[in-house]
Amino acid sequence: MFAWYKAGSPQQKKTFWACYSGWALDSFDMQMFSFLLPALTLTWGLTKAEVGVLGTVALVVTAIGGWGAGILSDRYGRARILVLAIIWFTLFGVLAGFAQSYQQLLIARTLQGLGFGGEWAVGAALMAEVIDSRHRGKAIGFVQSGFALGWALAVVVATLLLAWLPKEMAWRVAFWSGIIPALIVLFIRRHVKDSSMFERARQSRAPRASLSSVFNRKYARTLALSSVLVIGLQAGCYAILVWLPSLLNQRQVAAGSMIVTVFIMAFGSFCGFAVTADLSDRIGRRPTLILLSVCAWIVTVSYMLLPLNTTLTAILGFLVGFSAIGMFAALGPFLSELFPTNVRTTCMGFAYNVGKSIGAGSVVGVGVLSTHIGLANAMGTFCLVAYAFAVFGIMLLPETRGIAIENIGEADAHSPAAPLAQPASARS
């Protein structure tokens, strides 16, 4: 499982740690906010509607950030824009800690979301272009496991600060703490370079990325199906993760057990990232994503039907993290292998972040449907529809395991059903 890392060049290892740390920091800043909402609500007397806007605005604007960062990355380089994205969301996260009103915090969170959208696609493309095609799934998948680390750190930091400091100060310090891990920017600027593949593409006569690139009919079918895939995966994930605490509360699971469950879910997601990363290189991107989509829905149904106790809650929490979150380890390699180098991050950023923004609508959908059929049934229904949506997109996209992404041309981009040549090592 780790042979790819041991065999990697110093530059590949530095790139891995830069992308891993950037994604962990992104997760830390994003997940921290969810743990601070109760303190903010108490301090400023926010309504549920205001809390809802604060909680979703960053997710919505990630679509713009991902699209914009993708275009800039395809034009000016992956490493440079990765640094910019990290600086951006760190800066506005720190400024959020100085907010004196709801309106100021809303503006800071909105601007911070632009940076969140930019980091994922740029980091995934950078990693895809420097790693050997035989190990691309494992490498990018392990980068994705940085999400679990950032999530766990957010739980620890938020819990300690809220326990040690007055609530009106704790949330501010929590936002300010995001600047410490951002020192990774100094490492990236000094040690991480763009791949030779990207440099060759930039010097070629291939058309440069622009705002209109994603509307080019050459990429339209692949981009549309990629977006459908991401919408399904994100909708299912949000339907489970956002509403799970409420479901556990309905089942009268103790608050202490719920905190433990969050840690177990984070650990489960880390294990899921590792296994998914390896599995996608062994059996392919499509079978891996389909298998885990089915598993995630089964776990959700189990929450609906089984009588929950402490042990079962912990087991199912691990399985939720493993399947619903861990499956994203196969998404980065898959999307990076679908588009040519000259528009790779533009299309990846659009598909991932637009899909994420639309998929987040499942949070509202579950809430509305739950008033008619109950929360557990609403979660199960939405997850079934979401993962069926994802599988539909997967089935119409090609298997890409092991392809040489430097050879992806414009013909490949608009003919996803066409067979893609794979090296013998990838097929074995």
From Swiss-Prot:
Organism listed in the record: Cupriavidus pinatubonensis (strain JMP 134 / LMG 1197)
Function of the molecule: Probable uptake of 4-methylmuconolactone.
Segments on the Periplasmic side according to the record's topology features: 48-50, 102-110, 167, 249-252, 309-314, 372-377
Entry annotated with the keyword Lyase: no
InterPro entries hit by this protein: MFS, MFS_dom, MFS_trans_sf, Sugar_transporter_CS
Lineage: Bacteria, Pseudomonadati, Pseudomonadota, Betaproteobacteria, Burkholderiales
All ranges on the Cytoplasmic side of the membrane: 1-26, 72-80, 132-145, 189-227, 274-287, 336-356, 399-428
GO molecular function: carboxylic acid transmembrane transporter activity
Name of the protein: Probable 4-methylmuconolactone transporter
Keyword line: Cell inner membrane, Cell membrane, Membrane, Transmembrane, Transmembrane helix, Transport
Homology family: Belongs to the major facilitator superfamily. Sugar transporter (TC 2.A.1.1) family.
Pfam families: MFS_1
Predominant cellular place of this UniProt entry's protein: membrane
Residues making up the signal peptide according to the UniProt record: none
GO cellular component terms attached to this protein's record: plasma membrane
Transmembrane segment boundaries: 27-47, 51-71, 81-101, 111-131, 146-166, 168-188, 228-248, 253-273, 288-308, 315-335, 357-371, 378-398
